[in-house]
Amino acid sequence: MEHSTEIILSRVKISKNKLLKFLTLLRIVMTTAIPKAFEGIVEVDETYLGGKWINKRKHVKLRQKSKRGRGTSKQPVFGILCRSGQVWAELIEGVEAEDLQPRIEKQVKKGSTICSDTWRGYTGIAAKGYVHRLVNHGKHEYSDRKGNHINGLEGFWGYLKRKMAAKGGIRKSRLHLYLGEYVWRYNHKLLSLKEQENMLNKLIFKHIWSEN
């Protein structure tokens, strides 16, 4: 899956249509492998996916402004990273408290420590049973002496964007599948290829069984 369709086709005897269907199936089952609820110290943050402004088509340029970060018209993604190394991420519609905090409550156990920047979408999360630690990026603060930071999650965002960029363009309707793929790859990066293959085979079997 890290190679182009053309390269894979040159190595296996299968039609392009069947290959594309199989790759789609792999990405579908990867999206079902949701990590168990995190606990301990976790990092939360959002990012935005989309091509560079210079590559936008003219009609897109005319209807939207060139912005970075919150307020941009790009696709927002919300992520949660546990300091153990596991990450969870999901495409979201907005970045306000009503978009972010229900997802935190679902994916992070009460009593855990939430590390975030000072975005208003996280205001009030401490009242919901969490310890909340802030990192003020506006003051160029990326960590404090107590280990409160979101550097791990920002590292994942960098990994995700490099992988997405290497694909050369992804349809919005399929964006969630590629997000699921790279979350899965990141969470299982320490496994051997054989171990990853065995896990995927189990996921495929489970998916096919549930469909029947």
Task: Cite the ranges covered by each PLM segment.
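Residue-level recognition of single "structural anchor" positions
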Residues: M1-N212
